[in-house]
C-alpha cells in the first residue's frame, strides 16, 4: 500500500500546541483553555487571583522528579496541559542535570535531550499543550523585537512544532486599558498563526475593580480552540465522505471480472458522489484491477478488451 496520501486521506490531529508570551495575564489566559492541568514551575499561583484557580488542578513543581512522576499518572480527565513557564522549566532541567553548578558545554547535550524528551512526552498525551513564557528582546537592525524568554536553541527547536505563538500585551487607548494578543509575526514581535486567527484579538476583562469574576475565563476555549476544531470537523466530514465513496468504489470493483464489466465501470464512473481526488483514485484502482485480470487497455477508445 502506498504511503503517499491525498489531502482527503490525511490523519489530522485535533489538538493545538501553542505558546503565549508577553506582559501580565499570560497564566490567566492560558488557563482559559478547556480542562487544564497547570504545571507551575514559576510559583505563579501565588500571583494569580484565586478566582482563576477555581476548579483548576495544579502541580507545584519542586524538582524535575515531580514532572517525571506526574507524567506517569492517569491524566485522562484533562484536555490541556499548561507549562508555566517554559523558561523556568528549563531551569529545573539544568538543576536536574548539573545540580548547583553552572552547566558546561558538555552538559548541554544531556540538557537538550531532556528538554526534547519533555516536549515529545507532552505531544504523546494527545492533549492541547500551552507553554507560557516571559518576554525577552532581540535586536534586528534598529528594531527591537519582543520574543519569548527562552534559550535560542530551545526556542528554535520548539517553535517549529507550535501551531500558534501569541504575544500578549496591554494597550492604553483613550485612557482605557485593553489586553490584546496577536499571533501574527510583526516588526515588533515574533508570532505564528497556522490557525488563521484574526491579526489582533482583544482578551476580555473578567474581573471587576474589586477582583471579583464577572464572566467565565474561557477565551482560549471559545475564541481559539472552538473555531479551530470547527474547521477540523469540516475537514473530517470531507474525509469521511471521501472514505465513503472509496468504499462504494471498492465494492463495485469487486464485481469487475472481465473486459465487459471493466468497461461498464468506466461508463458509470461519474455516477459516484466524488469528493476531491476520488475519481482519479477510482481510475487508478480500476487500472490495478485490470492489470490483475490481464485486460488490455485501448488508449484510443479508452476501453478494455480481454486477453487473446
What are these regions (language model features)?
Residues 32-34, 125, 161:
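Short, structured coil segments at secondary-structure junctions
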Amino acid at each position: 500500500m502506498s504511503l503517499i496520501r491525498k489531502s482527503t486521506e490525511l490523519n489530522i490531529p485535533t489538538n493545538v500546541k501553542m505558546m503565549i508570551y508577553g506582559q501580565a495575564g499570560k497564566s490567566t489566559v492560558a488557563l482559559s483553555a478547556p480542562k487544564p492541568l497547570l504545571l507551575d514551575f514559576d510559583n505563579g499561583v501565588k500571583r494569580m487571583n484565586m478566582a482563576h484557580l477555581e476548579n483548576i488542578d495544579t502541580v507545584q513543581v519542586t524538582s524535575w522528579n515531580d514532572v517525571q512522576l506526574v507524567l506517569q499518572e492517569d491524566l485522562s480527565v484533562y484536555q490541556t496541559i499548561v507549562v508555566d513557564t517554559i523558561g523556568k522549566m528549563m531551569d529545573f532541567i539544568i538543576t536536574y542535570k548539573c545540580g548547583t553548578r553552572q552547566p558546561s558545554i558538555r552538559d548541554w547535550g544531556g540538557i537538550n535531550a531532556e528538554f526534547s524528551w519533555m516536549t515529545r512526552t507532552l505531544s504523546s498525551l494527545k492533549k492541547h499543550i500551552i507553554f507560557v513564557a516571559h518576554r525577552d528582546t532581540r535586536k534586528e537592525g534598529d528594531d527591537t523585537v519582543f520574543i519569548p524568554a527562552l534559550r535560542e536553541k530551545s526556542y528554535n527547536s520548539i517553535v517549529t512544532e507550535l501551531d500558534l505563538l501569541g504575544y500578549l500585551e496591554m494597550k492604553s487607548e483613550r485612557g482605557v486599558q485593553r489586553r490584546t494578543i496577536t499571533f501574527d509575526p510583526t516588526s515588533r514581535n515574533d508570532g505564528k498563526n497556522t490557525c488563521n486567527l484574526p491579526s489582533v484579538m482583544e482578551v476580555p476583562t473578567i474581573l471587576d475593580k474589586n477582583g471579583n469574576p464577572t464572566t467565565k475565563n474561557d477565551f482560549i476555549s471559545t475564541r481559539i480552540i472552538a473555531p479551530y476544531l470547527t474547521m477540523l470537523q469540516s475537514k473530517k466530514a470531507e474525509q469521511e465522505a471521501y472514505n465513503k465513496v472509496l468504499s462504494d468504489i471498492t465494492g463495485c470493483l469487486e464485481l469487475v471480472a472481465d473486459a465487459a464489466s471493466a468497461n461498464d465501470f468506466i461508463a458509470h464512473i461519474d455516477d459516484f458522489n466524488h469528493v476531491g481526488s476520488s475519481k482519479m483514485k477510482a481510475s487508478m484502482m480500476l487500472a490495478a484491477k485490470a492489470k490483475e485480470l490481464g485486460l488490455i487497455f485501448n488508449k484510443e477508445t479508452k476501453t478494455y478488451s480481454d486477453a487473446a
